[in-house]
Swiss-Prot record:
Cofactors demanded by this protein: Mg(2+)
Gene that encodes the chain: glmU
Organism name: Coxiella burnetii (strain RSA 493 / Nine Mile phase I)
Binding site for UDP-N-acetyl-alpha-D-glucosamine: 8-11, 22, 73, 78-79, 100-102, 137, 152, 167, 225, 332, 350, 365, 376
Protein name: Bifunctional protein GlmU
Reactions performed catalytically: alpha-D-glucosamine 1-phosphate + acetyl-CoA = N-acetyl-alpha-D-glucosamine 1-phosphate + CoA + H(+); N-acetyl-alpha-D-glucosamine 1-phosphate + UTP + H(+) = UDP-N-acetyl-alpha-D-glucosamine + diphosphate
């Protein structure tokens, strides 16, 4: 018996008040639907079917890299109707697991428990007990605790509304059972929809065993219906990430002001992360790294004993051990800091390598530049890499000293141990071991007077 997963992602999401389909909104930097697909893949199914509706072509275009089978639900006629669109693609002997594209934090542990505890010919649902179950379907049990049916909130009687045990919608049974039950559903309810939950009563009626597995916590089965629910779930997720990192030896100064946006975030012990730090995409931080407040790191690797000072923005960079960056530095894609390099305040780098022990301490732009070892780049230095049509490279060799307020008009090379005088504008190579100055000689104009203002 193989496993087929059906993810229902056809909800209209009107309460999101957004032109973006609900399932494309991110949680922890990853679209809601992608999170559910990633969890489903951990169960090793042979196929993942996604039933989409609202904004379907846009959803498929944005998430076309996901290894799923896309199925359109052309009319929003309910969850039962949505599963009916996918079930013909499942083999009769398949075990089918039904998930939801807007329930992003369901855990593999809970799903494995559901699959393991549901009889091969039975039906299993994930249930949860909530302090406020308003709006959710209630689990109806008999006097012996057996599940009899699921009643949607809008269709529930007054005594049923007092029940706090709810249906999460997550369900498993065989494809053969679903092919038998789904055509029997009707839409005689307040919403005039075909409810998937009505299959529970059909299962009970024919003596099929029905069981419930409790969710580990309420948040893992929390659906996203509006922006506020998404915001609350985001903070819960970030607290989980902060706790996980803290227990692994990372100091998070304030878990409420920490954001991890991506799945591939690896942080070694003894790293310290200050407030309002955002880690996005693939981020690796080695031992004893210190990240100051208000720092953004995206797709970046940072070596041990390096300090990133406040208000620095770093994307797609490699920073090796014992470096210092910032405050107020910007490292754009392709930037590499070799061991012991230093980038100070208001320095911007793009596709530039700063060699071992080299420094660019302040007020500098380095674009398309290769800098050797032990180079000093003075304040106000600019590598002029763009001629209006093409980008050109600057090379600064080992031991060079670049004075303040220097413009290096690429392409050119500054030789080994060369010194460039402050205020120079170079458009040709500077030879090694020499002082190169390219500026007008200072002069004083005798007898000059400032003009006087007219009355």
């Amino acid at each position: 018996m193989g496993l087929s997963v059906i993810i229902l992602a056809a909800g209209q999401g009107k309460r999101m008040a957004s032109s973006t389909p609900k399932i494309l909104h991110p949680l922890g930097g990853i679209p809601l639907l992608e999170r559910v697909v990633n969890t489903a893949r951990l169960l090793n199914p042979h196929t993942i079917h996604v039933v989409y509706g609202n904004g379907g072509s846009h959803v498929r275009e944005k998430l076309n890299y996901l290894p799923v089978h896309w199925i359109e639900q052309s009319q929003p006629l309910g969850t039962g109707h949505a599963v009916l669109q996918a079930i013909p693609f499942c083999q009769n002997e398949d075990r089918v697991l039904i998930l939801y594209g807007d329930v992003p934090l369901i855990s593999p542990k809970t799903l494995n428990s559901l699959l393991e505890n549901t009889p091969s010919n039975g039906l299993g649902v994930v249930v949860a007990e909530l302090p406020d179950p308003t709006g959710l379907g209630r689990i109806i049990r008999d006097d012996f605790g057996n599940i009899l049916s699921i009643v949607e909130h809008k269709d529930a009687e007054e005594h049923q509304l007092k029940i706090r045990e709810i249906n999460t919608g997550i369900m498993t049974t065989t494809a053969m059972n679903l092919k038998k039950w789904l055509p029997q559903l009707n839409n005689n309810n307040c919403q005039k929809e075909y409810y998937l939950t009505d299959t529970v009563a059909l299962a009970v009626a024919e003596g099929c065993p029905v069981g419930g597995v409790a969710a580990q916590c309420c948040e893992e089965v929390q659906g996203v219906n509006d922006r506020w629910e998404l915001t609350k779930l985001e903070r819960y997720y970030q607290r989980l990430m902060a706790k996980k990192l803290s227990l692994a030896g990372v100091t998070i100064i304030d878990p409420e002001r920490f954001d991890a946006r991506g799945e591939n975030i690896e942080i070694a012990p003894d790293v310290v992360i200050d407030v309002n730090v955002i880690l996005e995409g693939n981020v690796q931080l080695d031992r004893n790294v210190r990240i100051g407040p208000n720092v953004i790191l995206k797709n970046t690797t940072v070596g041990e004993n390096t300090e990133i000072h406040a208000n620095s923005v770093i994307e797609a960079a490699v920073i090796k051990a014992n470096c210092s960056v910032g405050p107020f530095a910007r490292l754009r894609p392709g930037s590499v800091l070799e061991e012991g390099a230093k980038v100070g305040n208001f320095v911007e780098m793009k596709k530039t390598t700063l060699g071992r022990g080299s420094k660019a301490n302040h007020l500098t732009y380095l674009g398309d530049t290769i800098i050797g070892k032990n180079v000093n780049v003075g304040a106000g230095t600019i590598t002029c890499n763009y001629d209006g049509a093409n980008k050109w490279q600057t090379k600064i060799e080992d031991g060079a000293f670049i004075g303040s307020n220097v413009a290096l008009v690429a392409p050119l090379t500054v030789g080994k141990n060369a010194t460039i005088g402050a205020g120079s504008t170079l458009s040709q190579d500077a030879p090694p071991d020499q002082l190169t100055v390219a500026r007008e000689r200072q002069r004083t104009i005798k007898g000059w007077h400032r003009p006087t203002k007219k009355e």
